[in-house]
Regions:
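Acidic/polar, glycine-enriched structural segments that form the non-catalytic walls/loops
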Residues: 2-40, 44-351
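Segments forming glycine/polar-rich beta-alpha architectures that bind adenosine-containing cofactors
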Residues: 345-354, 359, 365
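Alpha-helical support elements that line or immediately flank enzyme active sites
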Residues: 323-328, 359-374, 385
Length: 422
């Protein structure tokens, strides 16, 4: 089976092949495709499948469902928010990354049944040092305000010190690769320590001034003991960085764990965002990465019991159907009836994150049959925006209600009357 390429850390957690989507070769030109395919969502937020160390071609976007902004653009868009993925490892100031070293092994895998992203990378740096990194990433469906990354790092032919950077990046902008449409929808209101350890960044949307907080804390372990030394917090403009170092021995594995939490003032007052996130991360660390991941997998196990479709005789087709179900049910929100399911779900910024008539025509039947509470929320979303639909009808000379072709958070028409194409 394909999972046999991994060590026991991931092999024992991965499901059988018909649940797995693989990337077995790194090609920079394919980055944006795999960032979309490997996006993870939990109904509350979604983050693209970018690499932790960063790459030249990337759109490392994170969205919280329903957080829109217009600013100087011609329509309200899902706002790109501070990205917490960043983890960079250095040996003697040399970055251990897939675009900075020779790649000896490379595999990434989306486990749809467990709803997590795994990876295995073995690289050789300019001085011949080989490092094996395996990792697992998830955004919890058990507690939608918890996200985590665990890296298993093994220096294969050297001993020494590995320096670690954990980053929250608040510089991300919408349509970074489209000069005509570039825009930054947020401004920073805080860049500070989370507590004694950890980083905290807070931003607000430019138009409605909705505050969003993001906090993270990194730890390192060997044989169950914390080993991260020389910890410090630095701020570089709109980036917040937690630094530490690890003494490593040849052939001995260490674990690096990043605990993350995000809230908006839709869930708690703006003045309480920092303390709420601080307490959430304290609870996450106390609960433990494994226990939260297990609770997350248990939620998806129940979801798949309702949603799975089994096709015998064609594993590839079965995998494709499950892939569609996975992303669809990962985006639907059973707890919030003020958000919808956009045409690109929470995997990218095309269509501005807007909901079309596709929701009712193609998605609602699925949710009605499999997840009726989510279906009810999708209908309530339209009900909450009925007054805007009436205003839209009146604007266009009609009686009654006319729902917009493209809908964001306020029910006004977001489809432009005209647009410019190259």
């Amino acid at each position: 089976m394909s999972r046999e390429r991994f060590s026991g850390n991931l092999r024992n957690r991965l499901h059988s092949d018909e649940w797995l989507i693989w990337q077995d070769q790194y090609e920079a030109k394919e980055n944006l495709k795999y960032e979309s395919l490997f996006a993870l969502s939990n109904g509350y937020l979604g983050i693209r499948g970018s690499h932790e160390e960063g790459t030249k071609i990337t759109l490392p976007y994170l969205y919280i469902n329903g957080v829109f902004d217009k600013s100087e653009t011609f329509m309200r868009e899902l706002s790109t928010l501070p990205n917490w993925l960043g983890i960079r490892l250095y040996v003697e100031k040399e970055l251990i990354g897939i675009e900075d070293c020779e790649i000896l092994e490379f595999s990434r895998v989306l486990d749809m049944k467990g709803a997590f992203l795994g990876k295995r990378v073995r690289v050789k740096d300019s001085k011949g040092r080989e490092t094996l990194i395996e990792g697992i990433r998830f955004v919890s469906r058990n507690n939608v305000h918890r996200m985590g990354i665990r890296l298993y790092v093994t220096p294969l032919n050297y001993s020494g010190i590995i320096e670690v950077e954990s980053i929250i990046d608040g510089t991300i902008i919408n349509f970074y690769d489209a000069p005509r449409f570039k825009v930054k929808h947020t401004y920073m209101t805080a860049n500070e320590k989370l507590a004694a350890d950890g980083c905290y960044v807070e931003v607000a949307t430019r138009e409605n001034h909705l505050h969003v907080g993001c906090g993270c804390r990194i730890e390192a372990y060997a044989d169950g003991k914390q080993i991260l030394g020389n910890r410090m917090i630095s701020r570089f403009g709109e980036q917040s960085v937690e630094f530490g170092d690890i003494h490593v021995e040849e052939g001995k594995e260490v674990e690096i764990v990043k605990y993350v939490s995000m809230y908006t003032e839709r869930e708690c007052p703006a003045y309480a965002l920092h303390t709420t996130i601080e307490k959430e991360i304290e609870g996450f660390v106390e609960t433990g990465f494994d226990q939260e991941l297990k609770a997350h997998e248990d939620v998806y196990k129940k979801m798949w019991e309702n949603a799975d479709i089994q096709i015998t005789g064609d594993d590839e087709l079965n995998r494709a159907v499950r892939f569609n179900i996975f992303h669809l049910m990962s985006t639907g929100n059973e707890h919030d009836d003020h958000v919808n399911v956009g045409a690109k779900l929470l995997t990218g910024e095309e269509y501005g994150g807007h909901a079309f008539w596709d929701t009712e025509l193609f998605m609602l039947p699925f949710f009605s049959w499999v997840f009726p509470k989510t279906a009810q929320n999708l209908e309530n979303y339209r009900y909450h925006l009925l007054d805007a639909a009436r205003a839209n009808a009146h604007k266009n000379g009609y009686k009654g209600a006319q729902y917009p072709w493209e809908s964001a958070d306020d029910g006004t028409e977001q489809c432009p009357d005209w647009t410019i194409e190259p």
